[in-house]
Each structure stands twice: as C-alpha cells, then as structure tokens.
UniProtKB/Swiss-Prot annotation:
This is Phosphoadenosine 5'-phosphosulfate reductase. The gene is cysH. Pathway: Sulfur metabolism; hydrogen sulfide biosynthesis; sulfite from sulfate: step 3/3. The keyword Magnesium does not apply. It catalyses: [thioredoxin]-disulfide + sulfite + adenosine 3',5'-bisphosphate + 2 H(+) = [thioredoxin]-dithiol + 3'-phosphoadenylyl sulfate. Keywords: Cytoplasm, Oxidoreductase. It comes from Xylella fastidiosa (strain M12).
Length: 237
C-alpha cells in the first residue's frame, strides 16, 4: 500500500478535505485505510456503476466487509449481479435485511411507496435506513466507504471526501469523478455495468420506485417518482 505524506488530522476536516481533493481516488483510499478509524466497511447497492468502488476498495483491502441492504424488493438482475461481482472480486459480502418482511410491512401499512412522499419516507426508514444503521453498528464500523459522487444529483453537489457522523467517518473517494471517469475506470479494468444499464436504467434501487431514464428527465427523477433522490441512508446516517 502506498505510504502517503502527512496530511492534516481528522479533527481538522476542512483543511484535510482541501488536501484530499488533490489526491487520486486510489491515494484517498490508502490514506483512509492508514489514518481513519478501525473497522472499515464499504456499502454498495450493486447498482449501475457499483463495480467501480467494489474493485477500487478490494484492491487495497481485499477482505473489507461489503454491506448490501436487501430490501426484499430489488430487481432479480441486482441479485444476480451481486452474485457475479461477489464471485469475481471475492467479496466479503454482508447482507442485511429489514426486521420485517415486505409482506408483513404491506399487511400493516399497505404499499407505502404508493402513499406519496410520507409513505416513501416511511418505507425507506423501514427497509433501507434501519438495516444500514444496524449493519454499521453490528460490524462496529469506524470508517464507512461510499460511492457517492457530486454529479449524481443536486443533493450531492456539496459532498466532501471525508465527513464525520458522531464517531464514525464517511469516506467518498470518487466524489469528484464524472461519468467519463467511471467509464474509463470500468473499461481499463474490464468491469461490468449492471445488466439493466443497457435498458436505460441509470440509478437502480427497488423495482417499484425505479424507472429507466427518458428524454428530458434528470437522472435523479428516475427514483421515487421524482419526489426525491435520496433514500435516507446518506441523509440520516
């Protein structure tokens, strides 16, 4: 692993982020693995371009836990894609599910995703946020790697490379990457896009709240019927 020159300490996030902006994604990962808190983990939706972060992290930390929140409503293609990448990259996959099944949730609350923004928020809390929070706590994650990028939506344009949430640090090594950067990395390393990419799906979540991109649509409008882009994981954890 590359040994990097001294950077500002973690308690000076503003200055640290300025320095990290000058480093490559690979060196940002190396820095975090050397200097951020113990018990790192990577979360992945196994979405359209997820192979990039999975490949990047496992180059330097082959056994890093990879957290997948299985909401119970993922596309069949997503489950198969997760199997494919897990086998190819020898991932240390940790699958977390909601405390109650989708059938149970529907029996109690109906189809929450059809109940406007309040229903969508409640669904996301039960099926996404709670399992992710539980995963981070059970795995005692001190450093949480994500594949967030500023260009993905208007809600992510100000995302920093390093953020602090209580005692946990969230690291987004490719936050400044463009779609072109993603494509070049995937081409160079012969990595696959999600199978639904070729059908126009650019952001892939649950079956009932994901749409393919259509003319005059923003990428963020393909999720949650255009009500919102974020599922709550990166807003609330």
């Amino acid at each position: 692993m590359t040994v990097l020159p001294a950077l500002p300490p973690l308690d000076d996030l503003e200055t640290l982020n300025v320095h990290l902006e000058t480093l490559s994604a690979e060196n940002r990962v190396c820095w975090a693995l050397q200097h951020a808190p113990d018990h790192p983990a990577l979360s992945s939706s196994f979405g359209a371009q997820s192979a990039v972060m999975l490949h990047l992290l496992t180059r330097f930390a082959p056994d890093i836990p990879v957290i997948l929140v299985d909401t119970g409503y993922l596309f069949p293609e997503t489950y198969r894609f997760a199997d494919t990448l897990t086998e190819r990259l020898k991932l240390n996959l940790k699958v977390y599910q909601p405390l109650r099944s989708g059938t149970w949730t529907e029996a109690r609350h109906g189809r929450l995703w059809e109940q406007g923004i309040d229903g969508i928020n409640q669904y996301n809390t039960l099926h996404k946020v709670e399992p992710m929070r539980r995963a981070l706590e059970e795995l005692q994650v001190g450093t949480w790697f994500t594949g967030l990028r500023r260009g993905q939506s208007s809600t992510r344009t100000q995302t920093s490379i390093v953020q602090r949430r209580d005692e946990r640090y969230k690291i987004s090594p490719i936050v400044d990457w463009t779609d072109r950067d993603i494509w070049e990395y995937m081409k160079h390393h012969d990595l696959p896009y999600h199978p639904l990419w070729e059908q126009g799906y650019v952001s892939i979540g649950d079956i009932h709240t994901t749409r393919p991109l259509e003319p005059d649509m923003r990428e963020e409008d393909t999720r949650f019927f255009g009500f919102k882009r974020e599922c709550g994981i990166h807003e609330n954890i």
